[in-house]
Amino acid sequence: MFCIQCEQTIRTPAGNGCSYAQGMCGKLAATSDLQDLLIYMLQGVSVYATKARELGVVDPEVDTFVPKAFFSTLTNVNFDDERIIAYAKQAAEYRESLKNAYEAACEAAGKSAESLPPVAQFVLGTSKPEMLSQAPVALLNKDKNDIHEDILGLRLLCLYGLKGAAAYMEHARVLGKTDAEIAGRFHEIMAFLGEPSVDADKLFITAMDIGQLNYRIMAMLDAGETEAFGHPEPTVVNTKAVKGKAILVSGHDMKDLELILEQTAGKGINVYTHGEMLPALAYPAFKKYAHLVGNYGSAWQNQQKEFANFPGAVVMTSNCIIDPNVGQYSDRIFTRSIVGWPGVTHVVGDDFSVVIDKALALDGFQYDEIPHNITIGFARNALMAAAPTVVENVKNGSIKHFFLVGGCDGDKSERSYFTDLAKSAPKDSVILTLGCGKYKFNKLEFGDINGIPRLLDIGQCNDAYSAIQLAIALSQIFECDINELPLNLVLSWFEQKAIVVLLTLLSLGVKNIRTGPTPPAFLTANLAKILEEKFGLRNTTTVEADLKTMLNVA
């Protein structure tokens, strides 16, 4: 086992990364090894997908399968060995199919098939023990003693960034949005990473390419969500319980939420969002469901306590899931799509009857709690509509600064930095937030500036796209570069979606971003220095010191 992809990975003087019997996320060594093997198989598929594409052979099934299966290896997504093995076997079948199609296309074109790299020729074992014995071939740091640590760091930056992009591709696909050109570029990068490079410049360029690719993917996802559900609008949301039977929907998949709402209509069940599903409540399409009563709980890391206290059924539509046995609710939590946990019921297809039956059999909430409201829904359209008013308040001096404070949440005490930063932001500043990092402060009162709320919740982590559009619009209005705006980005990171959002921002030329609470363990000190010199990327320090720098206070 070697896994170093998330913020909570083990860090010791002897070396970084989880490499023992179990990772900090709860992932067992065997699961980690199988995931590495799956990635290796997917890279082999992408090699053939890329070569076949050069001859005009495109398989849409493969184009959707590879990102989806890759998504299953993100932090806190799938801990079920049998599901990972099934993905690996499916990858082997797709690779063989593409191999045959590629060779047939070569023959038809009168050319010889190329000799492809080992990753495209690897023969997957037929049993779990055999696959585990093959794991060293796919270990991400297998050649660490033969290469410079910066090379390994750059490879991992690319791999983890591409994982985040794969997740957004799958979210978009669920909403009916795919793009053959994007899929082709995705395969090219997967294939490149399957043949480990030692060229630092090429790896760095690839990291930026991944950021650019993800910008297009986020635009595609934004289109999928807004075309399906309308544009989010400022919406007041209750965060307390309502009397009645209950289902909690966590993750990111709004299509699943829609299906659950349709199937629970008239059944006396209240539906709540959780975590990154909170932004769904701002979409017009969901407002017709009176039994979508609000948001329950907070960010992913608190789920073992919150789900244990929730007297209904829970559906995990995507990341993040953690051990449900701790809170003894494994019999009433259900997984979907790429999510998996051993022993937990997995819902296949679009029928949520098993979830509904469980919710009806449980007690539900026995009384209404005193409501506590928050306001959400300041995504792209709402921000653009407010832009003239915002500009006017900037010009008259009422708004002097903007902070984007968001990203992933986590349980490290150092993450109180983000709460303190939001609290300490000057009263003449506006705070934009997104991702589950918002839960560090989104229930606090920040007031307004001439009717403009000082806290603007943009949405999910992928709604960084909305923030980028606002920044571009403001830079055009003020006729300046984005980096000349009175705007500072302070991003909390935890997993691979945050990595790819960061790469996207860097690839767009956004500078002086702060990240925290700790830098990625796979980034060497030298790489961190290069990123700081090139982009001004730096780690958070203290709220007082960082605010002085951001506000140019002597």
Curated annotation (Swiss-Prot):
Primary site of residence: cytoplasm
Residue numbers of Cysteine persulfide PTMs: C408
Keywords: 2Fe-2S, Cytoplasm, Iron, Iron-sulfur, Metal-binding, Oxidoreductase
GO cellular component labels: cytoplasm
Enzyme class per UniProt: oxidoreductase
SUPFAM superfamilies xrefs: Prismane protein-like
GO biological process: response to hydrogen peroxide
Cofactor section: [2Fe-2S] cluster; hybrid [4Fe-2O-2S] cluster
UniProt xrefs under Pfam families: Prismane (PF03063)
GO MF entry, a single one: 2 iron, 2 sulfur cluster binding
Residue sites binding [2Fe-2S] cluster per the record: C3, C6, C18, C25
Residues annotated to bind hybrid [4Fe-2O-2S] cluster: H252, E276, C320, C408, C436, C461, E495, K497
Comment on bound cofactor: Binds 1 [2Fe-2S] cluster.
Catalytic reaction(s) noted: A + NH4(+) + H2O = hydroxylamine + AH2 + H(+)
Enzyme Commission code: 1.7.99.1
Compartments where found: Cytoplasm
Function according to Swiss-Prot or TrEMBL: Catalyzes the reduction of hydroxylamine to form NH(3) and H(2)O.
Similarity-based family: Belongs to the HCP family.
HAMAP family referenced in this protein's UniProt entry, alphabetically: Hydroxylam_reduct
This protein's name: Hydroxylamine reductase
Organism name: Shewanella sp. (strain MR-4)
